[in-house]
């Protein structure tokens, strides 16, 4: 059940998580540039960096970068394949440790979670954060950074200021002093495109956005304005739910070594992706309600289309046929670089 508005919210973010898990498995690589992604082969086409150690980041390597580009920037790096099972096990261990502390914990992924310190408790948030860092490091060998505030969005921003391996607290008292001169892109949910549109209005900083007339923003951007103004002024979501996170969908995608031009190859790939994804759904005792297919062409044009099933199902014939039907909704008149299947769940 959701808690009452907490006195403090702590955002716990594991540092360079995937790389850190790999370093625990390969201690001989400590202090060296490590890059995780694909099958660990930097010559493999169309595979990207999933995570880079801080030593690799010093060379400009970033998540999402093609492995080949990463290899050029940091030729001495060690490349390792992704190991989701190991990351999932490490994440579950950390979450269990957080819950053992007795606070509500809301998990947001492998490497991050929110923890609420409720009103009326004498616990000092800095001391709680220090205890969290100590427990996680001693029990798992993983380092984390922790942001502290009175809402989720501000706590997450504080975590970015705490990295790596630190603690940072943002409050009403220091919000504008710390954030006022930063670009609006520093706010959660404000991306590069929005930043450019705001710049055309002469709005470049968090301070300027916080003091912009709401009518001007509403006429330009619509209803999302209220959220931006809330974030710019340091506001945000104060609810931390201790309910277990339940996935709403399962998905798989594949980037092909060469672009596909043959429709039968595309159909085979979509069928295999649908079956693989369905196997995971069945293993988790869920049922499928909608089937989505994503197509990315050689020009990186990306579209997703979706179909609702007549009734929830886990029948392989129904699911794979639905995936092929959705694929048929695309013209497929250009070479295809990537295909993905997402199954939405009841």
From Swiss-Prot:
Cell location: Cytoplasm
GO annotation, biological process: DNA-templated DNA replication; error-prone translesion synthesis; SOS response
PROSITE patterns referenced in this protein's UniProt entry, alphabetically: UMUC
Cofactor: binding details: Binds 2 magnesium ions per subunit.
Domain of life: Bacteria
Binding site residues for Mg(2+): 13, 111
Main localisation: cytoplasm
Record's catalysed reaction(s): DNA(n) + a 2'-deoxyribonucleoside 5'-triphosphate = DNA(n+1) + diphosphate
Active site: 112
Substrate discrimination, annotated site positions: 18
Cofactor(s) recorded in Swiss-Prot or TrEMBL: Mg(2+)
Subunit structure: Monomer.
Protein name: DNA polymerase IV 2
Organism: Mycobacterium tuberculosis (strain ATCC 25618 / H37Rv)
Gene that this sequence comes from: dinB2
